[in-house]
From Swiss-Prot:
InterPro entries: ScpB_csome_segregation, WH-like_DNA-bd_sf, WH_DNA-bd_sf. It comes from Coxiella burnetii (strain RSA 493 / Nine Mile phase I). Coiled coil: none annotated. PANTHER family: SEGREGATION AND CONDENSATION PROTEIN B (PTHR34298:SF2). May participate in chromosomal partitioning during cell division. GO terms for biological process: cell division; chromosome separation. Belongs to the ScpB family. It is found in: Cytoplasm. Keywords: Cell cycle, Cell division, Chromosome partition, Cytoplasm. GO terms for cellular component: cytoplasm. This is Segregation and condensation protein B homolog.
Amino acid sequence: MSEVNPKIVIEAALFASAEPLTPERLQQLFDEQNPISLSEIKNLLSELKEDYRERGVDLQEVASGYRFQARPDFSPWLQRLWEKKPARYSRALLETLALIVYRQPISRGEIEEVRGVAVSSDIIKKLLDREWISVVAHRDVPGKPALFGTTKTFLDYFNLKSLEELPPLEDVVDLEKIEAQFGEQLALVVEKKAAEGTEPSALPLAEED
């Protein structure tokens, strides 16, 4: 095979991959006869991002690496490709997820203490199944309750490189503020994912407590 432009190889790999790719993973595409440094990979990624600046897709860096995705500006048109409405999220799920995001690591009991009601096992299971949260440790007290934290999958879903990019909450004990502020952000992401055809509908709907 004749010599290929490495930028084109990287572009093809990013489109072919179902998951974000790191510069290190992209470097593995090139053999010892045609080595390429990490700095070169990053430069080529920057060039690709610029190449697509006026296109319908964007090269986005998230926690797990780089990926191509549709620009949110085109969501009104892309939504017409899918008949399903995006899933609505229950207040209980929004509050539970927001508390994990902003107070991690946190136990189920601590979430219940703040919310004042029991946390549905179904909500915890769905967040775990979605891989938005995981058990990161166990509290060193009798019973050793699991402590939950967010994952790279969560960051990827929200197009974040780190939790530091999340908007601050002045008081995470204020559940009205949690639902309004975090819920608004989640709704925007869900709308975008629905436009891209990547938003599953397997999360609890608003009728849950």
